[in-house]
Every structure is written in C-alpha cells, then in structure tokens.
Amino acid sequence: MTNTNRPIRRALVSVFHKEGIEVLAEAFVKAGTEVVSTGSTAKKLAELGVKVTEVSDVTGFPECLDGRVKTLHPYIHAGILADMTNPEHAKQLEEFGIKPFDLVVVNLYPFADTVRSGANEADTIEKIDIGGPSMVRGAAKNHATVAIVTDPADYALVASRVADGTGFSLDERKWLAAKAFAHTAAYDATINEWTAKHWPKPASLDAVEVDKDDQGTEVDSAKFPAQFTRTWDRAHTLRYGENSHQQAALYIDPLNQTGFAHAEQLGGKPMSYNNYVDADAAWRTVWDMAPAIAVAVVKHNNPCGLAIGATAAEAHKKAHACDPMSAYGGVIACNSKVTLEMAESVRPIFTEVIVAPDYEPAALELLQTKKKNLRILKVAEPPKGHEAIRQIDGGLLVQDTDLINAVGDDPDAWKLVAGEAADADTLKDLVFAWRAIRCVKSNAILLAHDQATVGIGMGQVNRVDSCHLAVERANTLADGADRATGAVAASDAFFPFADGAQVLIDAGVKAIVQPGGSIRDEEVIEAAKKAGVTMYLTGTRHFFH
C-alpha cells in the first residue's frame, strides 16, 4: 500500500447514465488522459472532444451476446486489478502487454428503474448488470493504485484531480472504494428483493429440501429467508431526529415509488422525523376503516381521536371531539378527499400535518394560504402490508405487519359469552372499536359511540390503569358529559383479572369486545353477566408496542 497520490494518466469509463459526464470529458481533454470506454459512453465522450479507445480495440474481441459481454476480458480486468506497488504485478502486465488503469468510472444498468417501470421479466433480467459490478468491485479491491468512481456527485472532484494532475491519496481512494462497495451491495440487494418476490421456492422442492432455522423449526423461507437483505436509498436528511440532539434521514425503497414515504408535499414546512412517524401512524389508522370515510387525529404515535362519518367534515368533527386538548399540535389523516367544509373546520386548530389521498381545489387553497406552516401531504394509494422491521442491539426483528385480517377480526367469528346479542347499531360500534384498537399502544382500552372514539386509554403497563384512563378521558373531556355510559369498549388483549372489565362496567359501558384467553376468563365473563353487559370474544389479539 502507498499513501502517495497517484496521478490519473489512464481511465476506464463505462456509464449507463451520461448526466454530468461533460465535466469529466473537459478534464480528460485538458490533461491529455488516455481514455478507454464502451459503446454509447465512448460515443458520447468522442462527441465531447475526448480521444477515446474502444474496449474492443484493447481486447481485440468485439462486443457479443447483445452487449452482455463487453469488458469481461483479462486485458481489461488485469489492468484494473494489478497492484502497481507490487513488482510482480507490474512485471506480469509488462509481459502480457497490458496497461494499468488509474481511474475507473462506472454506473450500472438501472435495475430498480426498470422494475418500477413495470417491465416484464425478460426486460428486467436484461437490466441486471454483470460487467459493471465486476469492474467496480475489482477497482475497489485494488484501491491501492486505482480510484473507483460510481457516484456522479463526485465527477466535479474527479475532474479537478484529473486536470491538476494530483490524483487521489490512499485515504481518498479507500473512501471512494467504500462508496463503490456500498453501491454494488445495494444493487445486489435490490436484485435479491425482486428475485425473492418473483422466484419463490417451487413446490417440487418442498419434499426434497425443508428450510429450518438454527433450532430445527421449519421456516417459510419466502417470508423469512436465511439472509435478510434489503436496501433503501437516502431521500434526504431531516432537520433532526426524535430529539434535537439526534441526527436523522429519510430512506426510500428503490423498487417502490408509492407509499407514504413518497408523499407529495403541497404546502408547509419540511417534514420532521416525528411528523413522519405520527403521519404514517395516522395514515395506517384511517385505512383500517376503509371503505368508510374516516378521519384520525394522532399525536406521539397514538390516536387522540378516530371517527367514521358520512362526510370527511363530519368524520373530522367527531374525531376531534374525542380529545380536543390533545389534538392541539397533532396530525390529521383522512382516507377520503378533503373537502372545503373539512378544511374550514381544520383551519382554527393548530395542526402539524394533514394527509389525504386528495383535496378539493378550494380546500387546498384555503389550507395553503391560511395555514402556511401546515404540512399538507397527498398520498394517492392506501398503505400496503409489508414487513414490520425493528432493530435491536446486534440484530433485527421481522414480522408481518399487523393488519385487520385475522379470523378474529371478522365479527361473524366472534363468540358471544355474556349478555344479549348486540343490536345492529351496537354491533357497528363494536366493530369500529375493535378495528380502532389496533392502532393504540398497548395496554389499550378504547371507548366508542356512534362510530367515534370517546375515550382512549393507551400505553399503560397494566390494563386496569388503561381502563381508568379511557373512562376518565371520556368523562372529563366533554364539558362534564358522561360519555362512558352507553358506550362500547374494546381491549387489545385479554383481561387478566376481572378488575379492568369491572372499571368499564361500573362506568356504564353496554358492551365489550376483547380477545379472551386468560386463565381467569370465567371471572371476567361472570362480571359482565352479573351486570347484564354484552361481551364478545374474538380469539385475536392486537398488541402494539
């Protein structure tokens, strides 16, 4: 290894995207750099006045197989991989008549762009680059004497070092090599993500090979592969993270141009880390209620209110009424077009973010002109059920995203264990409450009436406190009105004792829906029976941590 700068006398350039190449061309011409290139890149450089040698003239072998083989030749790769600080390498190059490269500039076939375009399988496969990654990895490995450039953002830097003859130091070449390895790793991870989805293990191999984890348990390898590889592209950095002393950035899936991360911002200040967290939670929450029109108000990743209405304005009014104090500085999500009437009701409320699939022109104009700091987001499509990924020290936890799709989420599968069967209106409220409870942090208790939340107890370490909190918020946030009486209640998990359910019963709820499954279920059910309260068991839990 050497710490000396190595001037750039000979360069290999092969890029799919030609943007910015003019900067390099000008420097090559000025410095008299010998340039070897391929196909369309060579043509572009020649048009810019660079004296170019085609790769085929170096190898003595033409491009073949529809361009699949261009640079895969010892005359190219030996020139990339020869460590010129090693006398044996230098001697062998001289024996074979091969000249070394000082600089390799490569960007790869646009695989992710091709996938996003909806291309068929054959066209997608053709955009899996082979020669490009080989050159990149070879040059990165041989950073002792070669500078590898994969990022067009570095072209200006490269041009200046070519033009002034200084080249790059070893530390700089290491930095460029690290970027190059990250580039090819992300590229391969993107290909892996696509192939894993489109080329699952065929049924013909199930009897031949059974995937098992390190404990001998059979594994669905399509869902949980032996190596979990994903890549995300940095969209932009954020002002700060969850707190002002934390740095943060937004990354997006290169294969997907939809989803909340790709929201179109129509007004307001830049999104913060907390804005993204709360708005994403609100967005998922309202779509749990589809196809009904729903509005959610979320703060600190918990709903302050959620409601279904005949119109967006009605749904917002009902959702806001649940907890007007907490809604201050919150995030509003609507799964329907925001109308002028809804915008007018939002206007006097301090709100950080509003997100919806669309806005009436008059509604958008009002929000843009009267609430200049309000972040206005438009997301055309509902959320998709991808994996839920959480990083822990030294690893990742991966699970299915919790959706309202379990057997116990269907009210037809519920088991009536106490009281009379709910009438149509009560059942509607129970179904609403059960769907709403999924988005509340555990331990979660939710009271609802007229398909709107009226009291929410969230995030308590015991269920009794969550029950007390839900009742308290129902009865102290409504100008003295008793909203718990006659409401229905939902619990995200079973009642371990009868005491939590008794709090709800004493508050006057008329029906409760909960998973069941406690060893003391009979005590809980008996408390409901004694009070004449309807109780359904779902058999499904919706913890949310």
UniProtKB/Swiss-Prot annotation:
The pathway it acts in is:
Purine metabolism; IMP biosynthesis via de novo pathway; 5-formamido-1-(5-phospho-D-ribosyl)imidazole-4-carboxamide from 5-amino-1-(5-phospho-D-ribosyl)imidazole-4-carboxamide (10-formyl THF route): step 1/1; Purine metabolism; IMP biosynthesis via de novo pathway; IMP from 5-formamido-1-(5-phospho-D-ribosyl)imidazole-4-carboxamide: step 1/1
Q: What SMART domains does the annotation carry?
A: AICARFT_IMPCHas, MGS
Please list the GO terms describing molecular function: IMP cyclohydrolase activity; phosphoribosylaminoimidazolecarboxamide formyltransferase activity
The cellular component terms of Gene Ontology attached to this UniProt record, alphabetical and capped at eight, are: cytosol
Catalytic activity, reaction form = (6R)-10-formyltetrahydrofolate + 5-amino-1-(5-phospho-beta-D-ribosyl)imidazole-4-carboxamide = 5-formamido-1-(5-phospho-D-ribosyl)imidazole-4-carboxamide + (6S)-5,6,7,8-tetrahydrofolate; IMP + H2O = 5-formamido-1-(5-phospho-D-ribosyl)imidazole-4-carboxamide
Coiled-coil boundaries: none
Q: What is this protein called?
A: Bifunctional purine biosynthesis protein PurH
Question: Could you tell me which NCBIfam families the record lists for this protein?
Answer: PRK00881.1, purH
Domain named MGS-like: residues: 1-150
Task: Extract one GO BP annotation from the record.
Answer: 'de novo' IMP biosynthetic process
Which family, according to the similarity comment?
A: Belongs to the PurH family.
Q: Which UniProt key words apply to this protein? A: Hydrolase, Multifunctional enzyme, Purine biosynthesis, Transferase
Instruction: Give the comment on domains.
Output: The IMP cyclohydrolase activity resides in the N-terminal region.
